[in-house]
Amino acid sequence: MNLEDVKKAEFVLKDVFSKIDDICFYNSQKVINAFWKNSVNEACFNSTTGYGYGDYGRDVIEKVYADVFKCEKALVRNQFISGTHAISTALFALLRPGDTLLSITGKPYDTLDSIIGFNDNKSSLKSFNVKYEQIDLVNNDFDYNKIEEYLKNNKVKVIEIQRSIGYSTRRSISIEKLEKVIKLIKSIDKDIIVMVDNCYCEFVNIKEPTEVGADICVGSLIKNLGAGIASNGAYIAGKENLVHLCSERLNVPGEADEVGPSLGANKSFLQGLYMAPSVVASSLKTIVLASYLLENLGYDVSPRWNEERCDIVETIKFNDKDKLIKFVEGIQKGSAIDADSTPVPTKMPGYDDEIIMASGSFTQGSSIEISCDGPLRDPYIAYLQGGLTYEYGKIAILKAIEDITK
């Protein structure tokens, strides 16, 4: 496969790319309006240490995020290690002994196993007598009848919705489906807290979960909204009283969001958010191209190049362990950092299967930079995401295709 083949593919994909550009422009307007409204200025880049009292930039960033998400309050902190850390913080903040957590998108991502208590971790929600229940999706949509029946017969404190696919074969959850199920939930019990794991999904569409009724929304800054510029961190956005509880869980009761030094992160948080619409668009174009080229080579891909996307993840089903490994190795070879390194399947914290991962990124574990990973289990699916620029993404895709077609 050569650049001429890619040009032919890009001609076919021009309408899809145009729609991605339209969404990028809409979200760019949303971000810049939030910057203007909150008078973002150079003083916001100043750093604090120690307790972090009076961190002007940090406070402005959280107001900007609240406006972008059209919600009451946001907590945007470099003290969060990951999106999983932010999800854990939110769950422990919102749930109390005897409460029930209900997942309506089936089993959550593997890294939540120890948080929920599937493996009897002594620090899990289960160890605090928090009950967990789940309702699986049906044909890539919510099981509305089961959800309605369960909620009418059981008291639920928090409903968790994971929009992206994790290491599953289902489709990601659209904003339209999210809005429909939240309306159903609130019609039965308006006090149920709907929490959405929004990782990999920000700025893929023109609305975020908090715009369609979600009470709280959580995501990572080494994914979409950090745009490859933020070195770490995560956010929690939503209703003021709930975000306040989360800030007290992250920090300490009584101090909440008034402490937490930025340690020089403010500029990268602001610049990352500023660039995020464009970087997400580049990532989407990268995986759309990959979907088209790999489908034409006979591979089972999802979503297909012309299907709706709700996250930045593309799955490629290889049904072959060696092909999966070769593809991931090819992405690593096509990356900017550690291109001469070879990914090796290994056990990783939070996962039951061996994982192979290509992440030639400037920030460790960054998923918005070109990356590819997958568990070594049948049917041997590669999960491809990212691309800081479309051009670099294209180069990596071609390198990976070259490796599996030798």
Question: What spans do the regions from the language model cover?
Answer:
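Conserved PLP-enzyme active-site core in the AAT-like
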Residues: 2-14, 21, 31-44, 52-55, ...
